[in-house]
Amino acid sequence: MEYNTSALCDIYMDQVDVVEPMFSNFGGRASFAGQITTVKCFEDNALIRETLEQDGVGRVLLVDGGGSLRRALLDGELAAIAEENEWEGIVVYGCVREVDELEDMNIGIQALASIPVGAAMQGVGEVDVPVNFGGVTFLPEDYLYADTTGIILSQEPLSADLEEDEEEPELLD
């Protein structure tokens, strides 16, 4: 399904938080949305792998990597695991690598930048905790919508049907 964050903001401005514009697209899917699962880690991607090995249908992985530009938290191998487990997308407040592989995958991926240096795999970090970056606090189970224009967050699912004439719009679960 395609999502348009500009249209969603026009309709739901009082219900959404807008993440500061700092992310670039790296995945093969231009827009994505889902209920978030958070991972907070710094230059270590073991918990990211563990989380991506779970069923990802209807989910977006939101990674707070502390904004580090020194090591990539996501690479082609981890993105392939995410794609295999049907994650909708991944947002990394940090870096990715192997960007040519990432852009060929059917998954949304946004991150600050790319760097060839990989992350450690010590398992240091936390899962499903509130995280804050980009002027927004992300809570586990919030709903994230992303496209090439930006990223927005809502506590409730937003209508997938942007026709204003509909009496009862279909909600995303």
UniProtKB/Swiss-Prot annotation:
Protein name from the UniProt record: Regulator of ribonuclease activity A
Organism (species): Vibrio vulnificus (strain CMCP6)
An example molecular function term from Gene Ontology annotations: enzyme binding
Pfam families: RraA-like (PF03737)
The keyword RNA-binding belongs to this UniProt entry's keyword annotation: no
Main function: Globally modulates RNA abundance by binding to RNase E (Rne) and regulating its endonucleolytic activity. Can modulate Rne action in a substrate-dependent manner by altering the composition of the degradosome. Modulates RNA-binding and helicase activities of the degradosome.
Subcellular location: Cytoplasm
Quaternary structure and partners: Homotrimer. Binds to both RNA-binding sites in the C-terminal region of Rne and to RhlB.
Alphabetical keyword list: Cytoplasm
Predominant location: cytoplasm
